[in-house]
Amino acid sequence: MLQVLRVSAPCFAFVDTIGSIGVCRVVRFTTFHNTPIEVYNKKVNDGVWKRDPYQETAVKAINRLYTELESYTQPPITQDSMPAEKGSILSWISPLKKMFSRKKSPTLTSSLPVPGMPKGIYLYGDVGCGKTALMDLFYHNLPPNVTRSQRIHFHAFMMQVHRTSHDLQDRYGFEIDFIDHIASGIAKETTVLCFDELQVTDVADALLLRRLFEALMKYGVVIFITSNRAPSDLYKNGIQRESFIPCIKLLEHRLQVICLDSPNDYRRLKSKTEDTYLYPANSPEVKKALENWFLCYADEKDPAHQDEVEVFGRKIIVPKASGNVAWFTFEQLCGEPKSAADYLSLASRYHVFIVSDIPKLSIESKDLIHRFITFIDALYDTHGKLILSSEVPVQEIYPTAPSEVLSSTADPAAKGKIESHYHGAFGGIEEVFTFTRCLSRLSEMKKQSWIHSP
């Protein structure tokens, strides 16, 4: 089934949720085929971008990939026929054959690269250093012979992977290799695949990615990844991390790893802003301002009402909505368990969000801040607009440095425990790290250019 989703205004994407993985396929119309380095230099000369030696190093690597893609032909993709659906007599025989089979599955490191396949790119660096902009520079200026390309946020991609795996399991049980089938489906429609904001915090994703990346490369898919972390730092201190190490080695071996160590945070360059992040939340003036923002974006033909958004058969209640604007309190948005799929579905349904009454959170509030960060990622990726009210300035709602972590806890014994947790445990440090990235995105989303974009 094909769906049309707004990916980033004013772009649209057709999403096939069953036939393939459902990755967003954005149709690009290009007249001139300049190389990435030519486009970069023009942006610098026109004053659109600031010359940055760190970015120039990355652009040279991107241009290398462009040149290699010009002469690359992806091999034809063949896929085994589907097995009998679950419940048929054949579905009972196959497991017995597998039980007595001594044939070993090929290991990840044993598969060889496709002949002539270009080496992809893994671009990482601090928040706001321009990773996504450079990926877009590459994606929107591919060689004319590359007609099948896809770019997707990592959260959205994994959501579709899990959804497709679930559909296949319902239909065929465990009679097929889900990962290989998904990868071949993507490869049939994709030569270049761009992942934005790769991060691994879930054990299920960690174990799945190891096989998925290998399968994609086996089918000749050239991969470009952006992340805030080096491959060696992915899923650090995570559960069963030793099982993820082969995936790290694979990324380091098959992709050109580039550290974008630019000291500039381009999202925080001076820009005129409007009052969209308001505090203190309990102030009558702030409450009135939020009402005015809601009226500004509301549809007068659609009176404010409670709405519902369905995700995988579940219903998410939207407390107050009108047209393309939705209003949640922080408790309503993040107080109960919600997944990346939930937030992406909300961000696809509404273009403007008002989030009120955000409290100051302690280091122990990992679940709450994780959901908030996931929501901001979904809203940023769909270029949604955000108005919020908080107890304290937004940059203070969660600790961002060890001193803040300790000062948020009064009990000396608890401080020692938290200090140990902060420096040694995966969960606490991960939320502190990702909240720093989140603040950079929030800063960009406050700019006038973002607020007044379509």
Curated annotation (Swiss-Prot):
Q: Does the keyword ATP-binding apply?
A: yes
Listed under GO cellular component are: cytoplasm; mitochondrion
State the source organism's domain of life.
Eukaryota
Keyword Nucleotide-binding present in the record's keywords: the answer is yes
One GO term in the molecular function aspect is:
ATP hydrolysis activity
Identify the residues that bind ATP: G125, D126, V127, G128, C129, G130, K131, T132
| Record GO biological process | protein quality control for misfolded or incompletely synthesized proteins
Q: Which UniProt keywords apply?
A: ATP-binding, Nucleotide-binding
Give the UniProt family note: Belongs to the AFG1 ATPase family.
Q: Which NCBIfam families match?
A: ZapE
What PANTHER family does this protein map onto? Answer: AFG1-LIKE ATPASE, ATPASE N2B
Report what the protein is called: Uncharacterized protein C115.02c
